[in-house]
């Protein structure tokens, strides 16, 4: 059985690239292009991994991460933060929000 990966990302080319590569490796991939829809879908069906953009149009990925990690249902789901924010201070903030890894 392949892992279910949920992507929350607002840039279509990035979604397409990530989804293409994960599909090719046999993962089941779902996604949303905004934070509020992402939260709703994640709560409906718990994924095995969340790829989360920091800068979303409606709610910060950092806020989403903090809120998910506070809930016992989601605390053990790995979250990888995807962002263009590459400063050390941003990485620390992302990891302190509960992200398991941080990719720029």
Task: Walk through the language-model features, giving the residues of each.
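His-Asp phosphorelay/catalytic-motif detector in bacterial-type signaling
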Residues: 2, 46-48, 73-78
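Conserved acidic carboxylate
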Residues: 9
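Charged docking surfaces used in two-component/phosphorelay signaling
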Residues: 16-24
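The feature encodes the CheY-like receiver
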Residues: 15, 57, 75, 87
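Acidic, metal-coordinating helix/loop segments flanking the phosphotransfer/catalytic sites
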Residues: 31-49
């Amino acid at each position: 059985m392949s892992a279910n990966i949920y992507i929350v990302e607002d840039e279509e080319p990035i979604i397409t690239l990530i989804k293409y590569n994960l599909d090719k490796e046999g993962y089941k991939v779902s996604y949303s292009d905004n934070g509020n829809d992402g939260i709703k879908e994640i709560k409906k069906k718990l994924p095995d991994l969340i790829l989360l953009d920091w800068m979303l149009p409606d709610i910060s990925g950092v806020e989403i991460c903090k809120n998910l990690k506070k809930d016992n249902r989601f605390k053990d789901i790995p979250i990888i933060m995807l962002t263009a924010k590459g400063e050390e201070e941003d990485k620390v903030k992302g990891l302190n929000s509960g992200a398991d890894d941080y990719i720029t």
